[in-house]
């Protein structure tokens, strides 16, 4: 095996988090000490962003269409229906919290060509809905090529419901296409260290410390919001449902589920850990055997927080004023989009343009925000997954008929 082949193999098998960290450090050093080299390195960043721009519309369309077309959500049990409601309601409250916190602590990012973006926001409800309706009825081919995510979303939902009763062979075809698109996405994300290296080098060379400080502030807001959801929103939901002190159960879920999910960065990979924890908690086996795998698919509070905060950061950066109606629409849209983000590498980040389209933010600007998300994703994605996965156990526990064992 040649030296080049060995290097590629070691890179493919390497730890992505460590590789991204190395890319960030090298990017900072290049940006500080060699502006010319940083400008050249930006080619990697531009290629990475371009690849994301190309695949994101196709991913959203295929992912949502396939999910609606193939998933069966009617499991019969009333308890399962309660858990599904809690998953969706909790995700919406997380999104609403993120929107509220973004208004209290607005974050502006250092982006390029922000003059491209729309800097006006419709003032009246009629104008908002008129804009939305005309975006929705766009030609689907044009929507995919131009990144009109509202139209993509509408056609994907319509197509998904229209195809729910198609043959199993047809559904399998869509599932296979979906898997193919996901493999392409995983390949692009595997190249993230090179793209992030170029983006960080160029950002440091062009803006100095200002760009990095805006990233750090954004990351702090994201992490604190997810902590707020874990310790306040989830606590209120548990208390409302059980009328008992929620924190002993919350701390058990965080200790035995969130810690593992933080390092695996995958809700699906954490399913065995969660099921073992449910068994220790004495939750009904017939309940958690369905609710835990289902939660790994649709319970995405952390993803909703990411989508909402980064979308509003884009709006604040380009100077768009968001009214109350648009804020509520964003909360709903972020929650809905988050439910389709499972199983996709960087899924919540790739759905940010969908939310940005609500504010007429230029597609290129939205993809720059996605790139920023990948830069801070080393921590953001880990905390997001920890919140998502631990909440699966939390909501399963409060819906269980059995006496919970909290002495573990």
Swiss-Prot record:
The keyword tRNA processing does not apply. Keywords: Amino-acid transport, Cell inner membrane, Cell membrane, Membrane, Symport, Transmembrane, Transmembrane helix, Transport. It is found in: Cell inner membrane. The keyword Transport applies. InterPro entries: Na-dicarboxylate_symporter, Na:dicarbo_symporter_sf, Ser_Thr_transp_SstT. The chain crosses the membrane at residues 14-34, 43-63, 83-103, 143-163, 181-201, 219-239, 247-269, 290-310, 332-352. One of its GO terms (cellular component) is plasma membrane. Signal peptide: none annotated. It is a multi-pass membrane protein. Pfam families: SDF. One of its GO terms (molecular function) is neutral L-amino acid:sodium symporter activity. One of its GO terms (biological process) is threonine transport. PANTHER family: PROTON/GLUTAMATE-ASPARTATE SYMPORTER, SERINE_THREONINE TRANSPORTER SSTT. Involved in the import of serine and threonine into the cell, with the concomitant import of sodium (symport system). Belongs to the dicarboxylate/amino acid:cation symporter (DAACS) (TC 2.A.23) family. This is Serine/threonine transporter SstT. It comes from Campylobacter lari (strain RM2100 / D67 / ATCC BAA-1060). The lineage of its organism: Bacteria, Pseudomonadati, Campylobacterota, Epsilonproteobacteria, Campylobacterales.
